[in-house]
């Protein structure tokens, strides 16, 4: 159930990234922002789905659009949507007795929603929209239909852990883009993280790096914020610890989560970046920005490894990722 949750969340984030990237590359937003596509493709490179290139160049963006289709639909592309949906179906079949009929059926119906490899961009966008709607429906069924036993808790732990990792991957794009001489599209990051309207209501201002960090890292009332995921992880691990017959079984995990929470709450987002004053300037990202994200990422990975050793002793401590760049953040 833990890995079912992780792969479900991983596939949802990839589908959202692909949807916004294809939309921006083919139609463009209502208010054009030149760095939208470059930002999204850079994040896909950071997460290992694409090679590192100059994604500001229009010809490279056009070439990469074909690569995005492969990530979405090709059965030969490792760690693309086809691969993830195939794994979800296999896991759902193995866990059939722990899932409701409707939940199991939604898991099995994700794979047929993928478009043909030679589909045009409009068909691809329509299919990605349908996939994300089904994933949202699946999340709703899991939330409303599953009893709060250990199966649900491990599924929830897997999802919250993976969402936390994906949030850090998105935010790493800000630092990466600044290092490469252009500003990351903050509107695009908010849209990909499903927080665009939340930001508008909360701040009623043009997106800035400090405020985006405040919303996506420090806001414990935002279900898409990192600290929200960590608090949910702690809540579920605390229940498992109380119900465990082995004293101290989850004590290490709780210590790691407490350290992450303290680190986030002690963060002063206003000192992590200096907003550009003109459109031609690049945002100045302080070294503490990457130090914070890398430190949080290492702590989440430490939590994952510790939980694996505590509960899945048959599993080796392995880290798999997409083919390009070995899935490493650079």
Give residue spans per PLM region.
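Alpha-helical transmembrane segments and their helix-helix packing motifs
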Residues: 1-330
